[in-house]
Amino acid sequence: MKHKKLIAGIVGIVLGVIITFFIPTPHGLTHAGMIVLASLVTANIFWIFNVIPSFATGLLMLSSWVVLGAVKFEVAYQIFSTTTMWIIIGGLGLGAAATKTGLIKRIALKIMTFFPANFRGQTLALFTAGTIIAPMIPSAHPKTAMSTPIAKGISNALGYKPFGKGSSGLFLAALWGFFVTEASFLSATAQNYAFKGLLPAKAQAQLNWGNWFIMMIPWTIIILIGGYFLLTFLFKPKDDKPVSREFISKQLNELGPMSREEKITATVILIAIVFWILESVFNIPAAITAIIGVSVLVALKVLTPEDFKTRLSWNTIIFIGTVMALGNVMQSAGLTTWLRKILAPAISPIIDNIYITVIALPIIIYLCKFVVVSLISTGTLITIGLLPFFSQMSFSPAIIAIIVTTSVNVWILSYMNAPILTGSAAVQDSMASRGAMAKSSIGYMILNIIGLLVCVPIWQLMGIA
């Protein structure tokens, strides 16, 4: 509809003004809480309809709290001095170096040489390469943009027609390996840190790199094995004979020998991952490890000041920060306590039992994705809605972050998932049919719930469920 953004913006502002100045403050809620609630309503409308860039909406939301007297500046913007923000900045810097030097592409192509040059073999290769590379780059868009052209080259070499079974299957295999497995590793995407940052401090402490990985092992196994059989069942061509690996060999030859910059980047990232895994042993915060790693890469001229300015998605970093600020401010303004009383009848049955939670919550998130496009916005809305109930859950709120990050990845309809749109644009929208996308998404949604259910015994052994 023409002028949709303008209309949505006006509606959002009007609702915010009405809630702030004209609706009497309900019993049990302070005026500061009303201001935060009003800003949240306005911001969500702006985010859903993309009225202005998301990061600008977030900054205006935080500023409104200060201007209208809900909280002081130091409280509103406190999130930008936390370790979570700096691990995101450092992680994105490491990922930028891995992409710039060609290290990621080399690793992916090298892995593919070990598998048969047919549909089954290259599907498995894309799964394997993506899973290995996932924790190295904490941003979905570069991974999807890099992996789908590789899948297209393989598809062409195997003689698959655009939008056919084989082409669709390899496109989805690239996304499955490089994008879907992001939920398996804390460092694989900035949104993992965003959802973690909304949790209470105790729950955040439970979600270090090693614990996250262990918590997700059963889910990862289900997603990889189930995903492989799903894609081969749906998309394997009738004649799946191996062909020459010439395309992959040619791509590797074009890269030439491993450069000095690649070797330095590989070493720094491997050391960083080791320190992240052993964070509790070395007692060095993950953010410090990431910052030192990026500083070393800059000092050794792998990354330049210009790279640091242009290769990091600063608008995304700021947006994530403004989203994470909501958790602390909602508590400070008393909004979480009030919401807990209001929403208790509807929410309590869902969170009373962990098995009910891991079935019901993903379904709620799937439905939300039809309305809220942004992955981070969807996850934030769900997490904020549950914030008031964290204290009465029969399990650790850390599990909420896990469920949210696995469940926002829905792509039944093309508009639902921006990183997948990026991957599709990288191959000129020439590989997968809409039907193939919908089928694979439904398959993932089912496997996701199964994977989460299988995780519950592990979580119970870890004492968090």
State what each model feature region is.
Residues 1-87, 211-341, 439, 443-465:
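Hydrophobic transmembrane alpha-helices of multi-pass small-molecule transporters
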Residues 13-16, 38-45, 126-131, 174-177, ...:
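Hydrophobic, membrane-inserted alpha-helices
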Residues 61, 108-109, 141-156, 171, ...:
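Re-entrant/interfacial helical elements at transmembrane boundaries that shape
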Residues 98, 414-417:
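Hydrophobic transmembrane alpha-helices of Major Facilitator Superfamily
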Residues 88, 120-134, 160-182, 207-215, ...:
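Alpha-helical transmembrane segments of multi-pass membrane proteins
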Residues 45-58, 98, 103-104, 178-193, ...:
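Alpha-helical transmembrane segments of integral membrane proteins, especially early/N-terminal helices
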Residues 25, 42, 55-161, 311-393:
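Membrane-embedded alpha-helical segments and adjacent helix-loop junctions characteristic
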Residues 153-237, 420-465:
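Membrane-core helix-loop-helix motifs of multi-pass transport proteins
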